[in-house]
Each structure stands twice: as C-alpha cells, then as structure tokens.
C-alpha cells in the first residue's frame, strides 16, 4: 500500500506486457478503479470491468466495485473510514438524538476488533436544535374594506387582520391569510386603447445556404389584440405597421459533414506492475468538417486494459506501539513510590512489506525516563463532571448516556527532568504506573461517581448504501 507522503512504486521494465480485455479469473468480475478517495469513500479513475478482485488488487493503491454505483472498497488492508457527519436531529424542537457511522473498508483482511470489510459502526448522541416548540397565534377581527382599486369598470378591494390574538411564540404563525380581497364595481365604463400583441416568429428563409437564384427573405407579423380598442367609449388604435420584412443575411455555405480516419497504433502499457490502460486514437479528417457541417460522431479515443501480471511493491507499515515496560532501574529490585528515576521501553513491528516495497521509516524501539508510582497510595481529589458520553447501545433498545467524576491522584512533586549521564543534558521524566488514589467518600463512592440519562427520540440505524438503492 502507498501511504500518505510515500513515493509511488518504482516502475521496472517487465519482460512482457499483455494488452487485454481479459476474462476475470478467480472471484466474480468487478469494476476496477485507479484511485480510492478517503474523504468521500468514492472510487475514482475507472480502469475497466470484467476483471477479478485479485487481479485488480495487484496494485494496493487501486479500488473496486462489485456493481456500478455500489460500495467502493480500496485494495489496501482494511481499516476504519472517517466518521460521517452527524445526521439531523430526530426532532426539530426540544431534546432528541442523532446518529453517525463509519465503515470498515479494504480488502483481504479485517479492521481492528476483527471486523469484516463493509461492516458499519454507529455512534448516537443527544441533540437539541431549538429549546422550545412553536406555538400558533390567533387572528384579530377583520378591519374595514379599503377603497376599490380602480375608478372605472371593475376592480378589487381588500381588508386586513393582525396575527396578535394571541401573538405566536417560538417561531409559530397564524393559519390562513392576513388579507382577503373581493370584486368591486364602480359602475363606470373605461375606454380600451389598442395595444400590439408580441411579434410572431420570423418565417423560415427560402434557402438555408447562400448562392441560390432568389434572394432569401423572412417576414413576421403582429395583431392589435392585446387588447383590441373599444368601440363605446372609443379607444385609440395601435400605432405602427402590422408586419415587417427583411433580407436573410449571413447564410453560410452548405455544410460538409466530417468523417473519421483510421485508428492509430495502440500505445504501450504505461505501468510495470498490476493493471494499466492503453489507448488508440483517430482523427476527424476523412473529410474535415466544413462550413458548419457536423463533427464526426463517436469517440476519438478508445482504451483497453493491459495486465503486466506483476504484483506492485507494498511498503511496510508500523503496528501500533506496544505497552510501556515496567519502570525499573538497573541493579535495583524496585523503585516504586520513591524519588528514584528509572527507564522503560516500548516496541512496534513493521508488517505487510512485500514485493521489494519500502521498509518502515523510524525507530522500532522507544525509550524514556520515568518515576514508578505503581500501586502507590496517593492523596486524590474529585474531578469535575466529564462531558456526556455517547448513547449506548447506538442501535439497541433503550440507549442511555453517562458522565462521571473520578478520584484522580495528586502526583508527587519530583523533579521533572534528570541528568542520567554527565554532559548529555537534562531529560524529561514521566510518571508511570497505576497508583491507589484516596479521596473523601462522595455519594457513597470512593473512586468513581456515575450519572446516567436515557437518550430520547432515537432514530433507526440504516445502511446509507441500501437507502440509495
């Protein structure tokens, strides 16, 4: 696998490159992609279909889909994706709950906790978008009618009312309209003046190419009907002409449609391991399109999958650091509960390196100076309440959330640095071990006080990939 910041695999010249659209061998055929986008979980750079997962994942930087639009899985070792954003709160007012998830993605292995690829892990937390819920208001009585909107013929008049009986609260509103209208008649006849309707479309030119026996022309017309002038009382007629004509200008020469030339040679396979993609090209020049003629139909390029049958290098990756060893000092039986600095170490393992990939960068062992407070009785103090934890179980019945106060030890005031060897400077010293803190009893407890609450309006856990189907 190519980790972030690592160089791309070295490309070695193979003894033979195979150009193919090969039938898949081994597992069912999949769609193979050249890139897996960690931020979105989507496959990028479609290489082609009809290949097996094993062939696609010769390059661990690639990714695959079992069907178009399906779940994208990277070819690297499985690990957990980023957490999704929190879903909307299950209620719009008062207290509710919301979910988020992450997925085990990868191939040929398991995520931490022995979880299979494709498995979802959920988190549930309490939420509150708005403290109060909206309360509807009530309308006042209708006000008086306003004057008619016109001075002749028929119009409308309006009356209004206020949303204040009572006023709405917390974003509520009054149902219905704040005003209403009705027809009104002035008993006076208005004159209607004529107005042109919009111009109709231009008629087609008599020819589509220039150079014909007659000069092409186009015409359009309009009607005095928007509205027509009234007779009693008399309205004014429409000003201007009812039609107009013009010459057709700028007509192009008759078009020549383009045609494809022959396909060119197939390009070499661009990779030396895993799958690649070759290309053929052709040119729209047989003939070249002219005078607005249509371009050649179809694609100017076509691609094929090429298989080097060579696995790509896989760089090593460090496991997580192991636990710190006990804090000891050479030639001393025990330094616990004493102002005597010692040393401790932890290690890690470089795993997964194959096919001449890069070795893990960095040290395999980490050493630090320490004071041992293992099983030391120390005076303690109660911490403040922790923040509320996640709702557990996120997908089970009756989830609850909890917070705690802990009896935390007060560490001894030993020197924070030591000089173990003269001339090598000061070294930081870390406290190590599990002390035995002692606090005054709180709510009947000596070490941990816990408070629990139920999570409200809990939504169901649903796979987002299934919701898209």
Swiss-Prot record:
- Signal sequence coordinates: 1-27
Location(s) in or outside the cell: Secreted
Task: Specify the glycosylation sites in chain numbering.
Answer: 83, 86, 92, 139, 142, 145, 151, 196, 199, 202, 208, 260, 263, 272, 321, 324, 382, 385, 388, 428
Which Pfam families does the UniProt entry name for this protein? Answer: TSP1_CFP_C, TSP_1, TSR
Q: Kindly indicate whether the keyword Secreted belongs to this entry.
A: yes
This protein's UniProt keywords: Complement alternate pathway, Disease variant, Disulfide bond, Glycoprotein, Immunity, Innate immunity, Repeat, Secreted, Signal
Q: Which InterPro entries match?
A: CFP_TSR-0, CFP_TSR_C, Compl_asym_regulator, TSP1_rpt, TSP1_rpt_sf
> Which disease is reported for it?
Properdin deficiency: Results in higher susceptibility to bacterial infections; especially to meningococcal infections. Three phenotypes have been reported: complete deficiency (type I), incomplete deficiency (type II), and dysfunction of properdin (type III).
Q: What does this protein do?
A: A positive regulator of the alternate pathway (AP) of complement. It binds to and stabilizes the C3- and C5-convertase enzyme complexes. Inhibits CFI-CFH mediated degradation of Complement C3 beta chain (C3b).
The protein here is known as: Properdin
Origin organism of this chain?
Homo sapiens (Human)
Q: What is the lineage of its organism?
A: Eukaryota, Metazoa, Chordata, Craniata, Vertebrata
